[in-house]
Structure formats: C-alpha cells, structure tokens
Curated annotation (Swiss-Prot):
Protein name (database record): ATP synthase subunit beta, chloroplastic
Gene name linked to the record: atpB
Protein's job: Produces ATP from ADP in the presence of a proton gradient across the membrane. The catalytic sites are hosted primarily by the beta subunits.
Catalytic activity: ATP + H2O + 4 H(+)(in) = ADP + phosphate + 5 H(+)(out)
Coiled-coil portions: none
This enzyme's EC code(s): 7.1.2.2
Organism classification: Eukaryota, Viridiplantae, Streptophyta, Embryophyta, Tracheophyta
One Pfam family linked to the record: ATP-synt_ab_N
Length: 500
C-alpha cells in the first residue's frame, strides 16, 4: 500500500516523467504490444507502461499496458488494458516503474471503477490519496487465522444447510432469472448490518447491461446511497465483455486489492463477489494464446492452476479481518470435469446452487437445499444440534423428492400414513426455507427479515418434531422466524372465519 503525496503544479509531474525510462512501440498485434527500451532501462515483469500521444486523427490516446514477457534484445511484450486503436509503431511508451496501482479505502464505496482504478460513473474523481498495487503476495502462514468459524448471513437456508465459512470461498451456481442478483444484494446488505462490514463487487467479463442493472438496483434498494455516497456499503469494479482480455484478466485483482485494504487496514469483515470466475479463466486463456504459449488441456492456458491459485490464495482470513468470497461459476456445457470449473472447485468451501424449479414455485431465495453443500457442516464445527437438524431436514426433503413421482401418478391418498406426514412436513420445510429480503422490500412491500442461526435451528426443530403439524403450510411461506409463522397461522384462521 502506498500513500501518494499530493502534487501541485505541472512542474513536479514533468520532472517525474523525465526520470522514467522511455521506450518505443516496436510491434502491435491486437492487444499485445512489443516495446523496445534503451539498454539497461528494461522494465520489470508486471510493471505498468503508459502510451500517451495522438492518433492519425489528432485524438488524444492514453493506453496502459502491463509487462508480461522480457523477449531479449531490449524488447518487452506487454498486454494492453484498453483498446489499442490508433496506436502506431515508434510511439513513446513510459515505464511507470511500478505495477498497476488502484485507489483503496472508504472513498471507493458507492463508486464504479475500471481495471485501472479510474471511476467510470461520471461522479467526478475519487477523493483518495491511498493506492495499492494489484500484484501482491498472499498473507504469510503466520498471519492466517486458522479458527474455523461460521459466517452468519441471516438467510435461513444458507445458515442451516450450507453454512459459509468466515474467510471462505463459496461458488454460486445459477442461471438467468433465478434470483442471483437479489441474493448477492441481500448478502451485501446483511454483512453491513450484522458484521459492520463492507463489500466489493468485481464484474469480470460481465455484460455491460447486467452491470448497469445491478448498479441501478443497488441504488434503488439503498445498498448504494445516492444522497450520501459515503454511507454506501459496496464498491464496484467492472471489466466488461467488450474490453480487451488484459482488462478482464486483471479486474478481479483490482477488486481483490480494494477488499484487502478493508481487511488489513480497517480490520473489517469483507464480502468479495466475483461474477464470473470462469470469465477470469477465459481471459487468461486468451492472453496466454496471444503471448504464444502452447495451450494445455481443452485449449486452456498451461498456467491455469497458478493463475487461479495466485488469486484465490489472497482471499483468506487473517488475524486482522476476513475476506469471504462468493464467486459465480459458469460450467461450460454443464461439464463439471472441464478444467475451468474443476480448478475452481478445488478452492471452494461451499456451493450454493440456485434452482429454477424452486424459483418457478415462487420460493425465494431459490437455493436448492439438496444440491447445495458445505465443508463446514460437520458436528465438530457447527455442533451436534445444528448438524442433526440439518441432516433431518435434508432426509425429509429427499424422501419428499422420492415420493413426488408416486404423488403425480397415483395422488397423495395412495401414500402410507407415515409418508403422508413426511410430505406435509417437507412442504412446510420447503416454504419455511423461503424468506422476505430487505433489498426486495421495494418490489414486494413486505419487510425484510434477518434470522439468527439459533432461531433458524429452533424453527426447523419444531416443524420436524410435529408440534406444528396442525398449522396450514401457507403460514410458513415468506416469514422470518417460527413465531411469525404461528402468528401468521392465527391471522389466516381469523381471515377464513371472517370470510365465512
């Protein structure tokens, strides 16, 4: 991390540029530039180079590149972070003498940045003098926090069945329209309220429209506070689909660098979203091919595991704070053995799978209770009571799933008394796994609910014990804790009597 001195006047800026080594463009192949430097003035790997000048039409050009290879004969091969249109051989290239650095700290909250850490939301410059290089080593072993603790989200289905690890990595699997964005926003909202933490969202190879939609929805739901931007709970970093592979490959590191500052300096719990981690791999594959490396399995880069590891190993808990990461994972052609998802799986502590079937039933969050998994769901970590309750909930739902074919063909009357009871309880559990969200208040009109882990366990234990068998299943739909479900049942009974 670096505190930048404030520079005043143009003289100081000119003198610093004079001290930098200057090279010239020798070759341009798409986003890859070869630059020749004077002998003894070669930049280091990962140094940031800047091309400034005018194109043939007289337009100002400002392109930042990153050194990837030292070719010999005083030439380096670099990858551009923005479009190379208008660049020509012979143009001057300035070596900044350091890796790409981006602004960090509270001033980044509520703002949108590109890979270079430049604000792109038309709200003026970012008021920060503190910057940090995007290439850093992972925390040393001595700094790591080895304690296994659950990261409580206040979302019943997650906390009970696939709990998140504090400082862990979670894979979020979901197609379009199943509530991924709303779940992301609720997690951002809840971490700010319950943990006093902040969030960083890294849009890696995103559709520009989706990034814009997310920003608008965050403003609407209050996650980004337009009136007082400092009150916002999230910083956004976008490297969109239309940008060169260099930008898409590095935007995840820009977001991670901002998150690391909140963890290490502010000692906060940070939530880091990466959407989509598979596009980070894809961008790395493109860059690898452009640099002339021999491809590995299925055409991926030979350095796939190293690149993934260098990003993932920085996402961890230290004695100061934690970075808990939620990463959307795209599975090419639904093939889980593809190198990209297979390499990602090796780093994940939990998976949250969103189901289209549950979304179609109107059960939100549409988290699949049987497909979602977590390494934290062990008796020695979560305790016997939590573990037993979660296992019984899964068994009940699994039995209901097995009986659905019989119900569809023969009807519920053909089931045994025991199975009928299981189905009734499973339907209550399924509905009780739904929950009203704070960020969805604007659309639904019903206030959001944060449910603590102890309350969640108590609620499911009561359903499983049969104490609530007499209550109608709609009483369990979109409520917070179990007391709200019993109160809703009384209200439903009163309403039905009034109708009669």
């Amino acid at each position: 991390m670096r505190i930048n001195p404030t520079t005043s006047g143009s003289g100081s800026g000119a003198s610093t540029l004079a001290e930098k080594s200057v090279g010239r463009i020798a070759q341009i192949i798409g986003p890859v530039l070869d630059v020749a430097f004077p002998p003894g003035k070669m930049p280091n790997i990962y140094n940031s180079l800047v091309v400034k000048g005018r194109d043939t039409a007289g337009q100002q050009i400002n392109v930042t590149c990153e050194v990837q290879q030292l070719l010999g004969n005083n030439r380096v091969r670099t990858v551009a972070m923005s479009a190379t249109d208008g660049l020509m051989r012979g143009m001057e290239v300035i070596d900044t003498g350091a890796p790409l650095s981006v602004p960090v700290g509270e001033a980044t909250l509520g703002r949108i940045f590109n890979v270079l850490g430049e604000p792109v939301d038309n709200l003026g410059p970012v008021d920060t003098r503190t910057t940090s290089p995007i290439h850093r080593s992972a925390p040393a072993f001595i700094q790591l926090d080895t304690k296994l603790s659950i990261f409580e989200t206040g979302i019943k289905v997650v906390d009970l069945l696939a709990p998140y690890r504090r400082g862990g990595k979670i894979g979020l699997f979901g197609g379009a329209g199943v509530g991924k964005t709303v779940l992301i926003m609720e997690l951002i909202n809840n971490i700010a309220k319950a943990h006093g933490g902040v969030s960083v969202f890294g849009g890696v190879g995103e559709r520009t429209r989706e990034g814009n939609d997310l920003y608008m929805e965050m403003k609407e739901s209050g996650v980004i506070n337009e009136q007082n931007i400092a009150e916002s709970k999230v910083a956004l970093v976008y490297g969109q689909m239309n940008e060169p592979p260099g930008a898409r490959m590095r935007v995840g590191l820009t977001a991670l660098t901002m998150a690391e500052y909140f963890r290490d300096v502010n000692e906060q719990d940070v939530l880091l979203f990466i959407d989509n981690i598979s596009r980070f791999v894809q961008a790395g594959s493109e860059v690898s091919a452009l640099l002339g490396r021999m491809p590995s399995a299925v055409g991926y880069q030979p350095t796939l595991s190293t690149e993934m590891g260098s990003l993932q190993e920085r996402i961890t808990s230290t004695k100061e704070g934690s970075i808990t990461s939620i990463q959307a994972v795209y599975v090419p052609a639904d093939d889980l053995t593809d190198p990209a998802p297979a390499t990602t799986f090796a780093h994940l502590d939990a998976t949250t799978v969103l189901s289209r079937g549950l979304a179609a039933k109107g059960i939100y969050p549409a988290v699949d209770p049987l497909d979602s998994t977590s390494t934290m769901l062990q008796p020695r970590i979560v305790g016997e009571e939590h573990y037993e309750t979660a296992q019984r909930v899964k068994q009940t739902l699994q039995r209901y799933k097995e009986l659905q074919d019989i119900i569809a063909i023969l009807g519920p009357d053909e089931l045994s008394e025991e199975d009928r009871l299981t189905v009734a309880r499973a339907r209550k559990i399924e509905r009780f796994l739904s929950q009203p969200f704070f960020v969805a208040e604007v659309f639904t009109g019903s206030p959001g609910k944060y449910v603590g882990l102890a309350e969640t366990i108590r609620g499911f234990q009561l359903i499983l014990s049969g104490e609530l068998d007499g209550l109608p299943e709609q009483a369990f739909y979109l409520v917070g804790n179990i007391d709200e479900a019993t109160a809703k049942a009384i209200n439903l009974e009163v309403e039905s009597k009034l109708k009669k």
